[in-house]
Amino acid sequence: MRLARVSPSNGEIVIVAVNDADVQKLDLTQVENCHKLCDILHSPDPVGLSKFLIDPNAAPIPIDEVRFLAPIDQQEVWAAGVTYKRSQVARMEESEAGASHYDMVYTADRPEIFFKANAARVSGPGQVVRVRHDSKWSVPEPEFTLVISPQGNLVGHTIGNDMSARDIEGENPLYLPQAKLYNQCAGLGPCIQLAEGELDKEATTIKMTIERSGKSVFKGETNLGQMAREFKDLIQWLTRENDIPTGAFMMTGTGIVPPDEFTLFDGDSVTIEIAGIGTLTNPVVKESYPE
């Protein structure tokens, strides 16, 4: 079952169940203290509650008549790094000074985890993601993203775009926060696939296409079977000595990295598709500022 925050043509924001061709409105007034998407996600039974809240009196809305919004309320966004072999190699190549650190963290018990964004820095479907004006080498990182309740339970999954300034991080690993965390540095959406049973990781494909002036300039594909970390372990490390009272999204690393000679340009378009969830597309903006 998939849930989303959408805006129909009348401009209101509603929570819906997402089908292939349409969406069904959820009537949150049926349950006390249920006002936002996160209230459903953080309930004891998100799937059961969602099914109960589907409004039988509301006609389904064609999917092309709604605008999908970022599926985030007040949660934090965190990210894990170097969880795929391809990412390990790329990070070692970009940073001579920190190459050995990236090599070691790939196999270490403790993963790399960093704070990525708050809700104000997140872009939803169709909204711009940003390249820092002081970066000459930036890429999108398509990531399977966990949705975690305040109790540390995995309640769903979505698509994440971890915008990254590779030259800034490569210059010095201590610059990681500046390479990762800035305005419009993350994309999330279009919906949340509620957690129901075990995922077929090999069948959960992740694809990314980057277009420039209407033409594809990069394509890549991987699947969750290539990931070296388990979701439960990442959540355990995230929540160790670290409460998440408003819940969290956790990007789980990338297995798709464009070649070293590639960088994003202003006006590019990034499309990420994950099987079972959907497609997230964001235009890219890079502005010029006087030094």
What would you call each of these model-derived segments?
Residues 23-24, 84, 217:
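Short, isolated positions in well-ordered beta-strands
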Residues 46-214:
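Active-site microenvironments in enzyme catalytic cores
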Residues 3, 144, 272:
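Short tryptophan-centered beta-strand motifs in secreted/extracellular beta-sheet-rich domains
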Residues 1-80, 233, 282-291:
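Generic N-terminal segment detector
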Residues 9, 164-291:
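Catalytic-pocket segment enriched in acidic/His residues
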Residues 7-10, 17-22, 148-152, 211-214, ...:
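Short acidic-glycine loop/turn motifs at beta-strand connectors
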